[in-house]
Amino acid sequence: MKHIPFESSKYYHIYNRGNNKENIFIETQNYIYFLKLMTKHLLPIASIYSYCLLSNHFHIVLRIKDENHLPEKMQIGKTKIHQPFSNMFNAYTKAINKKYKRQGSLFQ
């Protein structure tokens, strides 16, 4: 994912696709796990307005919470707001790589 400077109280369209246009969701359980990771990593910092998960890519429309509603460690000058996104994508990639005995980047 391209690093852009996320700002509190702003809306974003987050999207990514599989490396080499490969599928990132192989079976139903993959979609469910991705949604669980979204809940765990993104809901503490953002309101999710919509999402679309397709076999080889996804879209998420969200709004980063106001500064005073962000967890303390995410507030300006502490940890970067992009860190939960990185954690989510890394966790998903590791799970897919382990389950399907693959290695390397999952996302483009």
Description of each model-found segment:
Residues M1-Q108:
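Short catalytic/metal-binding and nucleic-acid-binding patches
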